[in-house]
Design a protein with these regions (language model features):
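N-terminal edge beta-strand
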Residues: 57-82, 172-187
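Short beta-strand edge segments in extracellular beta-sheet folds
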Residues: 155-161, 277-280
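Short amphipathic, basic-aromatic surface patches that mediate peripheral association
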Residues: 198-214
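C-terminal segment of N-terminal export signals and the immediately downstream linker at the start
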Residues: 35-68
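Short acidic/polar inter-strand loop motif in beta-rich domains
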Residues: 145-151, 265-274
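Low-complexity, Pro/Ser/Thr- and charge-rich linker/hinge segments at domain boundaries
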Residues: 43, 160-181
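N-terminal secretory signal peptides
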Residues: 1-16, 27-33
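Aromatic sugar-binding surface patches on proteins
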Residues: 120-126, 240-248
């Protein structure tokens, strides 16, 4: 079998040739090549299982194995990332009825980085920063309201790998002392461009502190945004989201002065909230 982009060497790769071939076959199945020819129905898709999976193959199996490759999904990401701890990703789509966006990285210990839910009135657009353990492929999967699954891919080479998902420094409490920074600006088309920056270390549980002790996992798990008390965006995040998570999205039909409220919860059970208003 001709090697696929899944089979490139990464800083986590100590895999046998057999595992590499399995990953390559899984990637083909993932995009519906040599597998199913129709999008999976909602009954065949286990998004929760895909998010919880610890291997790329398990994530694919939970998704039903064969999202259809779609040219209606656009990925804006670097082909070469200098820092694997913070790789900027922007996803947009013109797929009708898009309701969920998943980001997966095949070379990461935790394949699914984030799972975004986009209610009616919210554009199929999201911007964030993720961690990559080494060279790999970003898979973007979008689910539509008729149960269809569609995907696009983007290969990324990492100059300095995020092995262990290193974060700078060992002190996290000062980082949590400040509130989230929220900016929501109304454009000429009546859409609010929302940008949220949350102060949080997003510890992966895979690195040691300066004393050589393993730093426990500690990260934001759930994120929700309301506009004028209406849910407009939500997400589930994993250890593969960069520290101080940045999430940007767009909401149509917004008005100047409407109140935007952001709430998030982390693995300690702590919940925080911040508010802002839509401006011009």
């Amino acid at each position: 079998m001709k090697p696929t982009i899944l089979e490139k060497h990464s800083c986590l790769s100590s895999c046998s040739e057999r595992r590499r071939l399995i990953q390559g076959a899984a990637a083909l199945a993932f995009l519906g090549i040599g597998a199913h020819s129709t999008a999976k129905s909602v009954m065949e898709v286990d998004l929760i299982g895909a998010f919880a999976a610890n291997t790329f193959v398990e994530s694919i199996e939970a998704l039903g194995g064969a999202p259809l490759s779609s040219s209606l999904i656009t990925i804006d990401a670097p082909s070469v990332a200098e820092n694997g701890a913070s790789v900027p990703i922007t996803v947009s789509s013109t797929l009708p009825g898009a309701i969920e966006i998943l980001l997966l990285v095949d070379s990461n210990p935790k394949p699914v980085a984030a799972w975004f839910t986009i209610p009616a009135g919210t554009t199929a657009f999201v911007r964030t920063r993720i961690r990559m353990a080494g060279n790999g492929t970003l898979y973007v999967v979008i689910r539509t309201d008729d149960g269809g699954l569609y995907a696009a891919t983007h290969a990324i080479e990492v100059t300095v790998g995020g092995c262990g998902f290193q974060d700078e420094g060992d002190t996290i409490e000062p980082m949590l002392a400040s509130a989230a920074r929220i900016r929501a600006t109304l454009d000429n088309n009546g859409a609010a461009n929302v940008r949220v920056l949350m102060p949080h270390p997003m510890e992966s549980g895979m690195r040691s502190d300066k004393a050589g002790k393993l730093v426990p996992a500690y990260y934001i798990t759930d994120f929700m945004v309301t506009l004028a008390e209406r849910l407009v965006f939500s997400a589930r995040l994993s250890i593969a989201v960069s520290s101080n998570p940045l999430i940007a999205f767009r909401v149509v039909g917004a008005r100047v002065g409407q109140r935007l409220r952001v709430v998030w919860k982390d693995t300690r059970g702590d919940s925080r909230s911040s508010e802002s208003i839509v401006i011009t």
